[in-house]
Amino acid sequence: MWFYSVPEVIIGVESTAHTFSLGLVSGGRVLGQVGKTYVPPAGRGIHPREAAEHHAKAAPQLFRKLIEEFNVSLGDVEAVAYSAGPGLGPALRVGAVFARALAIKLGVPLVPVHHGVAHVEIARYATGSCDPLVLLISGGHTVVAGFSDGRYRVFGETLDVAIGNAIDMFAREVGLGFPGVPAVEKCAEAAEELVAFPMPIVGQDLSYAGLTTYALQLVKRGIPLPVVCRSLVETAYYMLAEVTERALAFTKKRELVVAGGVARSRRLREILYEVGREHGAEVKFVPDEYAGDNGAMIALTGYYAYRRGIAVEPGESFVRQRWRLDTVDVPWFYDLCNR
């Protein structure tokens, strides 16, 4: 167990997928972040080994940039937080090794952070939310959750691929590029009609893999690409709205916070604002600069965890490629309600 006063500076390391990013938090305030993103060759998805090689090259450059840009005194750093999972194994390991080496050099503890929890916490921090229903949507997550009994409890989730990944896969196959969500939405603007899509919702859970397959079949049948794009995103977003609406009705929450990279979607915002109005819930979206993977969210969540005594010796660092959101203790949850 590490003992301390209030931590002064926390450095956060994010490396779960295509982005390597370092973030900085001081006294619970986000100071900023730096990052680089691996962009796969056209027509290909993320290759874990190539992403890891990208991260390994980017790490020392970004560390120097962080120190210089924010005038960090390394003597003030109290802990190093890192994204321990879930994510791509090779990419996670690069971040963990870098964080461990930095912690050893500085003589400070490590704070392992759950990537999904970090998305939620940066959204709560940035929107000033206390006890919201959370919709976490990104390339790796599609979860509707709320806090109960010390953890985020899942009220609905994808049964296969995440919404961002599903749309990215479609975009890649039809040549729209990466990242796929904004590219597909841009293409959809040229369409004035929709075609019917299946809406696979099982109870409170969703299935997105079939939407990608169905959309590709429509393209092969000669349906105009903008029409398929518009139909795909409308269906995918209304599926989210359906399970979110049910969760709001069940939990009676009066705040809905939307986190993750797909939260940038303007069309999705229109749909979810309407859901909020119908249920008397205020809908808040994470700011765009914190929507995608970033080191600031790791540093911030690491700060909260460290204040609650959550830390490990550098030699005890670990990564978990699979790690459910609802298995993580969140003892700091109500600290944000007393700011």
Curated annotation (Swiss-Prot):
<feature type="binding site">
    <location>
        <begin position="136"/>
        <end position="140"/>
    </location>
    <ligand>
        <name>substrate</name>
    </ligand>
</feature>
<dbReference type="InterPro" id="IPR017860">
    <property type="entry name" value="Peptidase_M22_CS"/>
</dbReference>
<feature type="binding site">
    <location>
        <position position="185"/>
    </location>
    <ligand>
        <name>substrate</name>
    </ligand>
</feature>
<dbReference type="GO" id="GO:0002949">
    <property type="term" value="P:tRNA threonylcarbamoyladenosine modification"/>
</dbReference>
<dbReference type="GO" id="GO:0005506">
    <property type="term" value="F:iron ion binding"/>
</dbReference>
<dbReference type="InterPro" id="IPR043129">
    <property type="entry name" value="ATPase_NBD"/>
</dbReference>
<dbReference type="InterPro" id="IPR034680">
    <property type="entry name" value="Kae1_archaea_euk"/>
</dbReference>
<dbReference type="GO" id="GO:0000408">
    <property type="term" value="C:EKC/KEOPS complex"/>
</dbReference>
<dbReference type="InterPro" id="IPR017861">
    <property type="entry name" value="KAE1/TsaD"/>
</dbReference>
<feature type="binding site">
    <location>
        <position position="115"/>
    </location>
    <ligand>
        <name>Fe cation</name>
    </ligand>
</feature>
<feature type="binding site">
    <location>
        <position position="119"/>
    </location>
    <ligand>
        <name>Fe cation</name>
    </ligand>
</feature>
<dbReference type="Pfam" id="PF00814">
    <property type="entry name" value="TsaD"/>
</dbReference>
<feature type="binding site">
    <location>
        <position position="168"/>
    </location>
    <ligand>
        <name>substrate</name>
    </ligand>
</feature>
<comment type="similarity">
    <text>Belongs to the KAE1 / TsaD family.</text>
</comment>
<dbReference type="GO" id="GO:0061711">
    <property type="term" value="F:N(6)-L-threonylcarbamoyladenine synthase activity"/>
</dbReference>
<keyword id="KW-0012">Acyltransferase</keyword>
<feature type="binding site">
    <location>
        <position position="265"/>
    </location>
    <ligand>
        <name>substrate</name>
    </ligand>
</feature>
<comment type="function">
    <text>Required for the formation of a threonylcarbamoyl group on adenosine at position 37 (t(6)A37) in tRNAs that read codons beginning with adenine. Is probably involved in the transfer of the threonylcarbamoyl moiety of threonylcarbamoyl-AMP (TC-AMP) to the N6 group of A37.</text>
</comment>
<keyword id="KW-0479">Metal-binding</keyword>
<dbReference type="GO" id="GO:0005737">
    <property type="term" value="C:cytoplasm"/>
</dbReference>
<dbReference type="InterPro" id="IPR000905">
    <property type="entry name" value="Gcp-like_dom"/>
</dbReference>
<protein>
    <recommendedName>
        <fullName>tRNA N6-adenosine threonylcarbamoyltransferase</fullName>
        <ecNumber>2.3.1.234</ecNumber>
    </recommendedName>
</protein>
<keyword id="KW-0963">Cytoplasm</keyword>
<keyword id="KW-0808">Transferase</keyword>
<feature type="binding site">
    <location>
        <position position="293"/>
    </location>
    <ligand>
        <name>Fe cation</name>
    </ligand>
</feature>
<keyword id="KW-0819">tRNA processing</keyword>
<keyword id="KW-0408">Iron</keyword>
